[in-house]
Amino acid sequence: MSAGQTYYEFYRGSSIGTALTDALDELITQGDIPPQLAMRVLQQFDKSLTECLQKGVKNKTTIKGHLSTYRLCDDVWTFVVKDPQFKMEGVGAGSEMVTGSKIKIVACKSGDAADGKKAGGARE
């Protein structure tokens, strides 16, 4: 990890993040790894998943729904959308529509924007 660069930890709450955390907890409990190593693994997970999503996701998704709640706290936006409809383009041949009852979207500043640099397409 680059010095001074921090990554958000909210991907640890995903299914793969939870599985990793459970596996690391088991290894610590069995005495196979020290807790410091587990923390380094989780920090690398945060970094790797963030970079993978930034560089690897090229599909476009449009979300429509009813905005139920929104909040800004410490430069983190949280939106709760009821009855969302996701239209995903570039998935197979054409586009795919997925619906749900409620979603929570958490939006954070990118690394460039957090450092005060202008992010691609963002206005200050």
From Swiss-Prot:
The keyword Transmembrane helix does not apply. Its main location: nucleus. One of its GO terms (biological process) is positive regulation of transcription initiation by RNA polymerase II. CDD domains: TFIIA_gamma_C (cd10014), TFIIA_gamma_N (cd10145). GO terms for cellular component: transcription factor TFIIA complex. It is found in: Nucleus. Keywords: Nucleus, Transcription, Transcription regulation. It comes from the Eukaryota. One of its GO terms (molecular function) is RNA polymerase II core promoter sequence-specific DNA binding. Coiled coil: none annotated. The keyword Protein biosynthesis does not apply. TFIIA is a component of the transcription machinery of RNA polymerase II and plays an important role in transcriptional activation. TFIIA in a complex with tbp mediates transcriptional activity. TFIIA is a heterodimer composed of the large TOA1 and the small TOA2 subunits. Belongs to the TFIIA subunit 2 family. This is Transcription initiation factor IIA subunit 2. The gene is TOA2.
